[in-house]
């Protein structure tokens, strides 16, 4: 097919204080094998380290076919506003995001482009990701890329409420028009992926590649998301610090979920026309209420009595252990 007829893709790679890891991320987007129109936007959100210098250096050395745009904010905007700003710099029809510590497979653009051509009603397509974990004290390297799939992947339409499925920005390609529609509504500084993908869901169908991963998703040893990291339980002081960070993270997640629920309510009152039916919006609100209730439970867990924790405990030994007082629970995790 004529390359000019292939979907046009803007790859947005954002970074903030990621000098130590962003080379791999940039190398992976520079190494795409897609022959359609591509522009790559490297955007630094006011880093205090050499993140932007790495972006400049690698752009100057790049000799590939894609147009590269550099952007730097003097003052950090935060993840959500930064991504929204970078999308505003894009000129192509589809937006493919990547964080500065992740790694795209070379065929990522090509597979997404195939999916959106096969399903022209899609406003977004979501792939799977392969999680990779740092180990404290060990130099990190991404694994070798898997073998290139010989056949195009299976594609399924996501069914049910939006919040019944997981959506991660680095795993999605979204129409720019869906991002632009969402600009009319507030965006949270954290867990922005939920809201941006939700805006896409409101505008049309989301398709999934259920068996196909297209990127490596990196969990840093000190990252709050690295719940299984040995670093997290290196000592009691560190374990307790992570517990406090968890509470901050949960509050940020709750803010994002509540923003989506508020928008559902406003749409039901006629704020703006959307693709989704009244029944779908009501189902989405119910899913978000359940999420908020669960977040409240996690936030208040250590304030519950033993009997309350026991009645709410999860499955297996881990669920039983979590009924212990907090310090005993953390000590148990350190020893296991």
Task: Annotate each language-model stretch with its function.
Residues 7-10, 28, 39, 195:
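Cell-envelope/extracellular polymer assembly enzymes that use nucleotide-activated donors
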Residues 18-31:
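Short, well-formed alpha-helical segments that are part of the catalytic scaffolds
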Residues 23, 49-58, 103, 107:
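Acidic helix N-cap motif at the loop->helix transition within catalytic regions
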Residues 44-53, 75, 99:
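A conserved acidic beta->alpha catalytic loop
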Residues 73-90:
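Glycine-rich, basic loop-to-helix element that forms the pyrophosphate-binding segment
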Residues 95:
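Short aromatic/hydrophobic "clamp" motif used to bind/position activated sugar donors
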Residues 107-141:
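Conserved donor NDP-sugar-binding/catalytic core segment of glycosyltransferases
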Residues 150-237:
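Conserved nucleotide-sugar donor-binding catalytic segment
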């Amino acid at each position: 097919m004529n390359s000019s007829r292939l979907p046009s893709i803007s790859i947005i790679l954002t970074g903030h204080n990621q000098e130590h890891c962003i080379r791999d991320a940039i190398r992976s987007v520079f190494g795409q094998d897609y022959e359609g129109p591509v522009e790559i936007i490297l955007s630094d959100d006011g880093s205090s380290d050499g993140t932007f210098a790495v972006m400049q250096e690698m752009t100057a050395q790049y000799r590939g076919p894609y147009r590269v745009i550099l952007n730097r904010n003097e003052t950090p905007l935060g993840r959500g506003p930064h991504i929204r700003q970078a999308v505003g710099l894009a000129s192509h029809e589809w937006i493919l995001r990547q964080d500065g510590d992740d790694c795209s497979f070379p065929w990522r653009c090509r597979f997404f482009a195939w999916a959106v051509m096969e399903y022209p009603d899609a406003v977004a397509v979501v792939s799977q990701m392969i999680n990779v974990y740092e180990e404290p004290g060990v130099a990190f390297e991404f694994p070798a890329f898997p073998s290139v799939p010989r056949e195009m992947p299976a594609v399924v339409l996501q069914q049910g409420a939006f919040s019944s499925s997981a959506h991660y920005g680095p795993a999605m390609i979204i129409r720019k028009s869906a991002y632009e529609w969402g600009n009319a509504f507030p965006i949270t500084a954290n867990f922005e992926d939920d809201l941006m993908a939700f805006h896409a869901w409101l505008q049309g169908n989301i398709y999934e590649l259920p068996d196909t991963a297209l990127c490596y998703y990196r969990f840093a040893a000190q990252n709050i998301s690295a719940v299984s990291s040995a670093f997290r339980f290196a000592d009691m002081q560190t374990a307790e610090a992570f517990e406090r960070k968890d509470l901050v993270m949960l509050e940020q997640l709750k803010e994002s979920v509540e923003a989506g629920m508020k928008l559902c309510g406003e749409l039901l009152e006629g704020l703006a026309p959307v693709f989704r039916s009244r029944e779908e919006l009501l189902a989405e609100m119910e899913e978000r209420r359940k999420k908020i209730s669960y977040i409240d439970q996690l936030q208040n867990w250590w304030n519950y009595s033993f009997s309350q924790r026991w009645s709410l405990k999860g499955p297996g030994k881990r669920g039983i252990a979590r009924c212990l007082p907090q310090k005993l629970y953390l000590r148990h995790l350190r020893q296991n």
